[in-house]
């Protein structure tokens, strides 16, 4: 209840209820602290006002109640952190779905949009190299790599199937961004030179807002996108449409790599996705 009051959108992922429970507990705990300490503050203002105590008392409070209250607050916070927050975060970080079951998507952030790279029917990502980056090829897909001929590249909007785990591997072309999908209760930094995985399982069809949660420049306010959760049939139709529009994800004409260097395979292969417990 308090989460909705504070503006949190309805949960649309399988794990989101765990996040919501701990957030709601924290909010109620903070509310209790706020009203409790506010009442104590008002009591002190009245109890020790100048008219009743014209001379300052340098000994202070002689009762041990305040000390007990402080220790109780510290104990509750320690239980909340060690008993709930850390185990929940450990499960989110370490227990990835099996690679064969999950949809693997590379999310490449740039000022000021999110680009998505999906493998084609062969299940393999094509090579990417900065030497091939252009306005028509924002991810630098190697046009000479057979594995990338059927790849799908899209910007701003990503479609995923409902009830299927998704692993998003985050990276960036320029500065640090943060890929945040509030309805899915996931977020992660997109850092140049790093590949940072986050995962979730969408359980409700619909369109959900994607935002950048890291100040990344003058256009940060407009760095938004859409995550569309489809039925399996609609998702397959979208894949077919994107494959036709992108011509297999490849730019029309090949361009050589600068300096005659051989392009490197930048993205990780699908089999490299983290496995449960690792």
Where are these regions (language model features)?
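Alpha-helical transmembrane segments
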Residues: 23-36
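Non-transmembrane, membrane-proximal soluble domains of secreted or membrane proteins
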Residues: 1-25, 45-278
């Amino acid at each position: 209840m308090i989460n909705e009051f504070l503006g949190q959108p309805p949960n649309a992922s399988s794990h989101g209820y765990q996040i919501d429970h701990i957030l709601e507990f924290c909010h109620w705990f903070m509310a209790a602290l706020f009203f409790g300490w506010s009442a104590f503050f008002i009591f002190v203002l009245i109890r020790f006002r100048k008219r009743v105590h014209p001379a300052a008392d340098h000994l202070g409070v002689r009762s041990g109640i305040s000390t007990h209250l402080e220790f109780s607050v510290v104990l509750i916070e320690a239980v909340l952190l060690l008993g709930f927050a850390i185990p929940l975060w450990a499960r989110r970080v370490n227990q990835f779905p099996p690679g064969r079951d999950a949809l693997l998507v590379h999310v490449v952030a740039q000022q000021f949009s999110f680009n998505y790279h999906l493998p084609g029917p062969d299940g393999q990502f094509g090579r990417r190299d900065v030497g091939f980056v252009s306005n028509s090829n924002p991810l630098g897909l190697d046009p000479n790599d057979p594995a990338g001929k059927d790849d799908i590249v899209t910007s701003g909007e990503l479609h995923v199937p409902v009830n299927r785990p998704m692993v998003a591997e985050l990276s960036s072309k320029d500065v640090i961004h943060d890929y945040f999908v509030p309805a899915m209760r996931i977020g992660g930094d997109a850092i140049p030179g790093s590949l940072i995985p986050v995962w979730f399982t969408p359980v409700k069809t619909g369109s959900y807002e994607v935002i950048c949660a890291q100040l990344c420049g003058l256009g940060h306010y407009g760095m938004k996108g859409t995550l569309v959760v489809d039925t399996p049939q609609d998702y397959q139709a979208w894949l077919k449409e994107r494959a036709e529009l992108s011509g297999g994800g490849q730019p029309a004409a090949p361009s050589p790599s600068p300096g005659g260097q051989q392009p490197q395979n930048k993205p990780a292969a699908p089999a490299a996705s983290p496995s449960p417990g690792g």
